[in-house]
Design a protein with these regions (language model features):
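Membrane-embedded helix-loop-helix hairpins and adjacent transmembrane boundary segments
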Residues: 1-450
């Protein structure tokens, strides 16, 4: 539940009040509707705009793949599908996403956001209540968790591993600040009152949905086991081809045991609705960013027909690569999402935040953040997640260090890139040249900042 609380407070409430007004006023004043466009105009650099557009397109792909992966696990559980069946579900969802975005566009995405929000609020409360009730109530469920280990830490306030829990909170809460959707979200806000309403609604929604989801996940050990000799009614979690337990199947297994068939159907609708909203948003963000920020400035007579054609091509490419990655069952949902957010927010968080508050923020500092965010992500992925035999010695050495912070975790790597971005940008900006004074003053004039 701490992750859900962090998502609500750090990921929803604080951004609205801390950067909502500034992001809205500045992005509208300089007419920046996307994150790459913001970097290009705020820092007077077309190269930054191009680089950030490419980063957005490339690293939204694993995020999209993680959504497909989750859907395939859930549908596989509900309909008892094998590996081939799960792959078919991924492909069908990709086709559905493409049709939905192409035919419906932004209006369909917005309408679906509203409808799926209502479904999620109702559904998550029901699912959480039944998950706990199945184990004789909250107190009995917590006591059962405590009894599973000698120290009882599974039922403690901060869980068995609070240090690595902090990494999850940072990645999923602070990480949202640097995602490319942030500029679009605040650009579209009409006035100051809308900021207050948005802060309240999004925070309450995050507490219920994110808090409820993580709260439910805390009881997964009562429904699943990794021990093949366990004779209880717990679901056995098999080992994947990479030798690691397939953790992505745990929550579907929990739902299968805790819920009646009717409510499992509700969960399918719930997740499908939420996933369709997320997928359509990601596809639109990626394809429109690359089209408007990379292609449009370089092509003459780029009319609406050409723009739509190019966007559809990018949508097809984006979804195709996402499906290929999602079909690789060795890539877990958390790993895909961690590397995506680690690269995106690790690259963009510092430049975006300081671009709103610090007049001396420099293009060079942005480049440093881009290179470190993307570079650390790629290096960590190659060393610890791709199972490259040449790096097995490095993995063993890190394992033998006995560090309480899991250095092999892509979640912690992503959290590290975000914190590093916040540290590096002001340091590098202190000894590198800021953009032209007139352009900086013009950008900040909308904020009445002297």
């Amino acid at each position: 539940s701490w992750v859900g609380i962090g998502n609500a407070i750090i990921g929803s409430l604080i951004p609205f009040f801390l950067i909502g007004r500034r992001a809205r006023l500045m992005s509208n004043h300089i007419d920046a509707r996307t994150m790459p466009d913001f970097f290009g105009k705020r820092f007077d650099s077309s190269a930054l705009k191009t680089a950030s557009a490419l980063i957005v397109f490339v690293f939204l792909i694993p995020y999209t793949a993680s959504v497909y992966n989750g859907l395939s696990r859930l549908f596989g559980m509900v309909f008892d599908l094998g590996e081939n069946g799960a792959t078919i579900i991924i492909i069908l969802m990709a086709v559905l996403s493409a049709l939905y975005v192409t035919l419906g566009g932004y209006k369909a995405t917005a309408l679906n956001d509203f409808v799926q929000g209502i479904i999620m609020l109702i559904g998550i409360g029901t699912v959480v209540a039944l998950t706990v009730q199945k184990k004789n109530g909250f107190s009995a469920a917590v006591d059962s968790l405590k009894s599973m280990t000698e120290d009882g830490k599974l039922g403690s306030l901060f869980g068995p591993d609070p240090i690595n829990l902090l990494g999850v909170v940072i990645l999923t809460s602070l990480g949202t600040w640097g995602l490319p959707q942030m500029v679009q979200k605040f650009y579209a806000i009409k006035d100051e009152q809308a900021i207050k309403k948005g802060a309240i609604i999004s925070t309450l929604f995050a507490i219920v949905v994110a808090g409820g989801s993580y709260f439910m996940g805390g009881f997964v050990r009562l429904y699943c086991t990794l021990d093949p000799a366990d004779t209880s009614d717990k679901a056995f979690i098999e080992t994947g081809a990479n030798g690691k337990p397939v953790f992505d199947t745990m929550v579907p297994a929990l739902l299968h045991q805790a819920l009646p068939n009717l409510l499992i159907g509700l969960v399918v609708v719930l997740v499908l609705s939420a996933s369709l909203s997320t997928l359509s948003s990601l596809v639109l963000t990626s394809s429109s960013t690359l089209t408007n920020d990379l292609i449009r400035p370089r092509v003459k007579n780029f009319d609406d027909k050409k723009q739509m054609l190019v966007m559809r091509i990018f949508i097809a490419v984006f979804l195709l690569i996402s499906v290929i990655i999602a079909c690789n069952k060795n890539a877990s949902i958390s790993t895909l999402m961690s590397y995506s957010w680690g690269a995106l927010s690790g690259a963009f968080l510092g430049p975006f935040l300081y671009g709103l508050f610090l007049k001396k923020a420099s293009p060079a500092a942005c480049w440093v953040s881009f290179f470190t965010g993307v570079g650390i992500t790629i290096i960590h992925m190659m060393l610890f997640s791709l199972n490259i035999s040449a790096f097995s010695g490095v993995v063993q050495t890190v394992n033998d260090m006995g560090c309480p912070l899991n250095l092999l975790s892509p979640i912690n790597a992503g959290a590290f890139t975000m914190i590093l971005s916040l540290i590096l940008v002001p340091i590098v900006s202190s000894f590198t040249k800021a953009p032209d004074d007139k352009k900086v003053e013009d950008a900040f004039s909308s904020l009445n900042v002297k």
